[in-house]
């Protein structure tokens, strides 16, 4: 898809001629690519529902411009709006995971789009400040060695040291994803162009130091504007802690929360069968 002089890669599975409302997926990061969403292909095959996923500008098979001024929420919202127009998607279900959920919240609250039949907020957040607080709370549960390495990196603002990188990997494996093994699906093992610059400029050096263009992201008080049925999903060991999830649920007018007991930041990977069953029922109920 042409967008602002660049190209946005999109992928559609399922039956576009189906009478079922398309599901549009917004990946995390920024910069994480659509790849992990290929785990939704079976849902499309089983139900016929069209599912649209895409690589947001700055990663994957989309253009990766060398322009740090681009990495703003407004640009990614414009890309989403352009995608809906380009693919003629007047009515959709919208699922955003992590940063993708932030994008969905910004889109819904600030632009009041028409035709969103339901919203699925997967392991996401409404407050960068609360998110950072909760990540630091979980860091305090790590080994003294890892805590010290992270604290030193934060004090020096140097996130390149070996001790820090090891500690951060421990944190992310505990609460996000990985390690990838030969037993994982091909779409997880496949190499991809991660949007490192988009992530660093828009968010920051890691999950617990939001210092980028999204550092002032505070939408908890605006969630009241999301009047569509909303499903919040998260895992018990998630970066999206139960407090982060409940903070959203308490402010959303029409929210339901499903907490997956054996999942981290990507419940649709860690508990794929349970997640897809829940999602299939949710979508059918809100078509």
Curated annotation (Swiss-Prot):
One short Pfam name that applies is Abhydrolase_1
State the SUPFAM superfamilies in the record: alpha/beta-Hydrolases (SSF53474)
EC number(s) from the headed UniProt entry: 3.4.11.5
Q: Which residues participate directly in catalysis? A: 98, 238, 265
Q: Under what name is this protein listed?
A: Proline iminopeptidase
Please tell me the species this chain comes from.
Lactiplantibacillus plantarum (strain ATCC BAA-793 / NCIMB 8826 / WCFS1)
Protein's gene: pip
Compartment(s) where it occurs, according to its Swiss-Prot or TrEMBL record: Cell envelope
Identify the residues that the record assigns to the AB hydrolase-1 domain, covering every copy.
22-271
- Family per similarity comment: Belongs to the peptidase S33 family.
This protein's GO CC annotations: cell envelope; membrane
Q: Which reaction does it catalyse?
A: Release of N-terminal proline from a peptide
């Amino acid at each position: 898809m042409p967008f602002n002089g660049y190209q946005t890669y999109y992928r559609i599975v399922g039956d576009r001629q189906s009478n079922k409302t398309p599901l549009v997926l917004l990946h995390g990061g920024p910069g994480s690519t659509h790849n992990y969403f290929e785990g939704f292909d079976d849902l499309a095959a089983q139900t016929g529902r069209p599912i649209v996923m895409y690589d947001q500008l700055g990663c994957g098979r989309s253009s990766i411009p060398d322009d740090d001024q681009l990495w703003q929420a407004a640009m990614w919202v414009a890309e989403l709006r352009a995608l809906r127009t380009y693919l003629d998607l007047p009515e959709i279900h919208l699922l955003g995971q992590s940063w993708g959920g932030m994008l969905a919240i910004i889109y819904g609250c600030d632009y009041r789009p028409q035709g969103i039949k339901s919203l699925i907020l997967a392991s996401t957040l409404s407050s960068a400040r609360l998110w950072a607080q909760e990540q630091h709370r979980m860091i305090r549960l790590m080994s003294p060695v890892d805590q010290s390495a992270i604290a030193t990196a934060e004090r020096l603002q140097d996130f390149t040291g070996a001790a820090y990188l090891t500690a951060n990997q421990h944190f992310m494996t505990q609460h996000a994803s990985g390690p990838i093994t030969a037993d994982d699906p091909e779409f997880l093992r496949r190499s991809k162009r991660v949007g490192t610059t988009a992530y660093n400029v828009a968010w920051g050096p890691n999950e617990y130091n939001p210092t980028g263009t999204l550092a002032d992201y505070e939408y908890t008080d605006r969630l009241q504007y999301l009047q569509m049925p909303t499903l919040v999903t998260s895992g018990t060991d998630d970066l999206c802690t139960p407090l982060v999830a409940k903070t959203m649920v308490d402010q959303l007018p029409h929210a339901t929360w499903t907490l997956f007991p054996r999942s981290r930041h990507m419940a649709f990977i860690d508990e794929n069968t349970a997640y897809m069953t829940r999602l299939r029922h949710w979508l059918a109920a809100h078509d």
